[in-house]
Regions:
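RecA-like P-loop NTPase motor core of helicase/translocase proteins
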Residues: 1-386
Length: 386
């Protein structure tokens, strides 16, 4: 439920003199084309990009970016008060423990007790790194139910990034190019819904003539070729060739490539591993997969969108290994995940102290959550019982 703290701070920012997007948001409301769930997600997205610098969640919470707790009226020991007033990460975790569910029940009363009584034994920065999966790149998850317009929200994020990137081309918070990955377990899913990104009308979120100018610079590539190319000596993977056609890559802006995660996953070996154990056919498959991964890693200012993150399991782990490599090779803007069900298959434990575990049942990197129940009667039909 960390997203509740993010939303609270976002709402404050939207009303503050520091907010630079009020006119843009008002324009989106006036156009009346985007759903409320999508507009709220856009507010969070731009808040994290502009006010928070697109930094990783562990860093934002450690720095106290979402803190609003008044410690002065709270009953604390002298030692706990000293730590909580000087350590922003400690105050952030305490504020999280005080959150309540929809029935008003406190989220984590035992966590509150441990923080107040054993603060001196807790490495808060380390705890936040573990809570957010130990990744050093930006990794935000937007949770919207099916039918909320997730694909058009992806398109909106793409156009908004390009809008701000054109105004501030050297600002690392905004992506210039985008890789959209369909779930690895659903081999037929690329594609028809994600192809709808191409149909999005940017005038719904950005005024003319800017919207049309942005539309002109966008170049869509659907990486769904199954066989290797025969005509090119340099690139044998036809999907890699599609990206290679946009050389010089260092000047590239506006590429939106859509593919299945299966095509980039580290399914067999890395280049450094012993290849003698594979037959020729297997080696060809490995080299073709490596080719696509390598050229994606060279795309500058890249943002990766992962659809249906909850399909996780082994495929998700392998995909994360690939993304890790991309973050090292070139300028990289981060990962955006999208899921209708942001729940873990099993409880994940994070050690707070030697005797206390934080138990997570939800994906912790959710930055925006729109529950299914809110969609029913809004944009989803109420089921009719006969």
């Amino acid at each position: 439920m960390f997203y509740k703290l993010i939303k609270k701070k976002c709402d404050e920012w939207m009303k503050s003199p520091d907010c630079t997007i009020r006119e843009l948001i008002q324009y989106i409301y006036t156009q009346n084309k985007m759903r409320d769930a999508q507009i709220e997600a856009i507010k969070i997205y731009l808040f994290l990009k502009i006010a928070c610098g697109n930094r990783p969640l562990w860093q934002l919470f450690t720095e106290g970016s979402f803190n609003s707790l008044d410690l002065t009226a709270m009953e604390l020991t002298v030692e706990a008060r000293e730590i909580l007033t000087t350590n922003k990460a400690a105050a952030a975790l305490l504020e999280y423990s005080l959150l309540t569910d929809k029935n008003g029940k406190q989220l984590a009363p035992e966590l509150e007790k441990v923080i107040k009584s054993q603060s001196e034994h807790i490495n808060y920065e380390d705890v936040f790194k573990k809570i957010f999966y130990g990744v050093n790149y930006t990794d935000y998850l937007f949770s919207l139910p099916m039918g909320a317009g997730k694909t058009y929200l992806m398109a909106a994020f793409i156009y908004l990034d390009l809008y701000f990137a054109q105004n501030e081309p050297s600002n690392p918070a905004f992506a210039h190019n985008f890789m959209v990955l369909a779930p690895s377990g659903l081999k037929s899913s690329i594609i028809p819904s994600l192809k709808n990104i191409q149909e999005f009308d940017p005038t719904w979120i950005i005024p003319e003539p800017t919207a049309s100018n942005l539309r002109r610079i966008i170049k869509f590539e659907i990486l769904d070729e199954q066989k290797s190319a025969k005509k090119s000596n340099l690139v044998r993977n036809p999907n890699a060739q599609k990206i290679n056609n946009h050389q010089p890559l260092e000047d590239l802006m506006g590429l939106v490539a859509i593919t299945n995660a299966e095509k980039v996953i580290l399914d067999r070996v890395d280049k450094d591993e012993d290849t003698k154990i594979f037959d020729k056919e297997e080696l060809v498959k490995i080299r073709i997969a490596n080719e696509l991964r390598d050229i994606i890693g060279k795309i500058p200012h890249l943002a990766v969108f992962i659809d249906e993150v909850h399909h996780a399991a082994d495929g998700e782990i392998k995909l994360r290994q690939v993304v890790e490599e991309w973050t090292k090779k070139h300028s990289f803007c981060g990962v955006l995940g999208f899921s209708g069900t942001p729940y873990l298959e099993k409880v994940e434990n994070v050690n707070l102290t030697d005797s206390f575990l934080i138990k997570n049942t939800d994906l912790s990197n959710v930055v925006y959550y729109y529950p299914l129940i809110k969609g029913i009667g809004n944009f989803l039909k109420v089921p009719e019982v006969k």
